[in-house]
Amino acid sequence: MSTEWAAWSATMRPPQLQGRWALAGYQPGRGPVFGQVVITAQGDPNSGEFTTETTFTYARGGQTVNRRGRGLVYTGFQWRGRSSGEATSFPIRGVSTDWRESLFVDRDWRGAEGRWFTGAYNELGLDVRLRRVGADPIVLGTAESMIKTGASRQELHLFGANFPSSATPADVNFGPGVTVDRIVSATPTQMVVSVSVAPNASVGRRSVIVSGATGEASVAVYNTIDFIKVRPQSGLARLGAGAAFQKQFQQFEAIAYAKGPDGKADTKDDVELGLVDALWTIEEFTATFKDDDKDFVGEIDAESGLFTPNIDGPNPKRKNNANNYGDVWVVAAYPRSAGRDAAPNARPVKGRAHLLVTVPSYIMFDQPEVAR
């Protein structure tokens, strides 16, 4: 037994998590989500059992999701739960709309963070952070991840809790070079502001401050999108084999960057600007003579970046009746319009990542009751 555990267990008490929590999350490929979770205690106060009612909005698309769930807190700080709701988040045929939840609760019961996930291999999900709502304002984040230098009247959508209903431009601060022109609209949980950025404003990330409150929310000031990177850089998908062995999907996303003060790409001072909408394609990762993996491993959605693998095989269309496994390049082109345009002057910014498509996992190490 460690000294840390001895100190913790000596003062361990039943978790007091009931109440309203502000939610900030991120789903790869779709961007940030913001909302709230209402937690209600169930049964014996010492049981650590709770129910949840969750509502959140995809900031970039505006879709709202409602879910209900149950959770159990182990050792005072480990939340394990399940929730059910609509298929809005992962509209993939055959993927369960039930999510599993794994969260680490802060010692003071004022915050929690972890992951909500689904999929046969737990590969689809959101990273989430919860903050208990009190009387003070909470700034969760923005729908827009970047604002351009020299541009006027750019609208930013802010999300949080306890925003002032009669906010003024003086209540919102993005730092030097960014002027808040006016408050377009304001509610306790959302605010729309119009901002102008000076041509000589410093490039980089800016904390968002509302009525003196700040958190992890930030927005990037940029001149131009210099390059993009594909995340993850190494992806993994698994072929399907009917009902017995389901497919493992792989979600890709394109992240924009601006060069830092050194003027070079791929160095430590690069500025991450955030998620952008790219055009997605697959190219051959040449490993052998006359390699043809891209024709058999599966398909990628040209707009969402979601890769759906093929079924396993053997495939009589492949040499030696081979299976449909292989590896390919996943390529993102930004903007989408330039990626589709074959004209000589269409020069999209491109990035790529490696994807390995392999056989199903024939042995699942989760116990059967975990999936229930």
Question: Predicted regions span which residues?
Answer:
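Central antiparallel beta-sheet cores of small beta-barrel/beta-sandwich binding domains
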Residues: 15-104, 115-118, 123-124
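A short beta-strand micro-motif common to beta-rich folds, especially ectodomain repeats
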Residues: 201-212, 314-345
